[in-house]
């Protein structure tokens, strides 16, 4: 849940609820990060790592980073980790799905950061991340801003190769 989502719920729905979000998946039958009733809630942040999850945020080189956007990873095997895909000879698809980006580290595919308070912020899927001029920008960040305009009914953002770089193009449908 985004910071704006937290504010909306606390302002418009219920002020005294312990709101939390998650990041996980059906493939792992679990959460990498999730809420914790015993920790404070900070708008837009997920409080904790999941039980048995050695979760971290990596930069492009596989180094651990704090307060900077990067890739959500799990550095060690975990209890509910799938061990293979059915009919995947030589585990090629399995390795490509989770272990291709960082050697022997599970790459979840979420663009995230760990904050100075120890919470996690999820910005969207990293496979929908654009990289113009070497600056990583999640499409969710663009959509979050575009959705603030009542005049816009729908939008889609793409990255286009242009002059040895990537440029961002936003298409909109007006109301």
Report the location of each language-model feature:
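Conserved AMP-binding/adenylate-forming
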Residues: 1-119, 126-129, 142
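AMP-binding/adenylate-forming catalytic core of the ANL superfamily
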Residues: 78, 104-175
């Amino acid at each position: 849940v985004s910071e704006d989502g937290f504010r909306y719920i606390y302002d418009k729905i219920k002020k005294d609820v312990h709101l939390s979000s998650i990041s996980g998946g059906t493939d792992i039958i679990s959460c990498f990060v999730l809420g914790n009733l015993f920790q404070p809630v900070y708008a837009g942040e997920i409080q904790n790592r999941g039980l048995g999850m050695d979760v971290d945020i990596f930069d492009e080189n596989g180094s651990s980073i704090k307060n900077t956007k990067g890739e959500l990873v799990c550095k060690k095997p975990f209890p509910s980790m799938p061990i293979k895909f059915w009919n995947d000879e030589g585990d090629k698809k399995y390795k490509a799905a989770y272990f291709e980006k960082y050697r022997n580290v599970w790459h979840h595919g979420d663009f995230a950061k760990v904050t100075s308070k120890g919470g996690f912020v999820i910005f969207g899927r990293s496979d929908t991340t654009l990289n113009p001029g070497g600056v990583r920008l999640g499409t969710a960040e663009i959509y979050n801003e575009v959705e603030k305009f009542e005049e816009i009914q729908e939008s889609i953002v793409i990255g286009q190769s242009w002059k040895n770089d990537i440029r961002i193009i936003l298409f909109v449908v007006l109301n």
